[in-house]
């Protein structure tokens, strides 16, 4: 087990680059170390922060508790069956690196999720998604450390209660399960999912008439994301800041009468998902700045750390965006990242 550090600077551990310190900090290199970590005097399951890539958190002030940085690495193929390859990745693996690894193996299923920041362990929590694919589509099971019993358990896909940007790990399982690895069921034969946005055109341009591959899709997704989204190493951000709101069919129809070009995505239950970025853009908020935080000038869905933003700058800007969108559309926006402490949640 690694030694505990105290008053550790967390700025390098959150992609928005907010300045905060951890009262105590320890790096986890192997899942088995969890048995020792939970017995540390600094450990309190009600206040511990399990930290991955830091791409889905907003640190509003110094963290008054233990931060466990998940650095366990490793990828292994478990089995092949009926055209599927089951691959286990440890929670500390960088998500994009893992996606590229599966693409290089000729496997299909994760290519649409290329270049999403964060770690493998965080992917089921948020049920990350992009370009018509959600990670729940390819997760077979999730291995966790159960803090109630202090044993390792394996949860099936169904056990995880996946929904849009939701899972068991954000609801009743929050504070109980520590994700240590994820098993993915990936296809040996490439089945493209190109029904979202401008992805099909980008893939066609790359493949130039030949049959497209998973690598083509991954490369196209990377190119599109790089053209729209800032690199968090250059300009601090947490990717998409707001969830795409889901409204009733009646509300969507009313809005469509006023805004005929409004993007909308009918859902199986009859509701309609709207594009948060489009709503924000219609309010002419690109480039709007409060303190050091700003709405990105090319992608309205992204808030950025433009000039040493304080936590209060980010909170005020997010609140302003939500209020402005609600005033114009009567649609509520909700933030994707987690506010820490949660009392700051919008």
Language model: regions and residue ranges:
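Beta-rich strand-turn-strand
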Residues: 107, 311-314
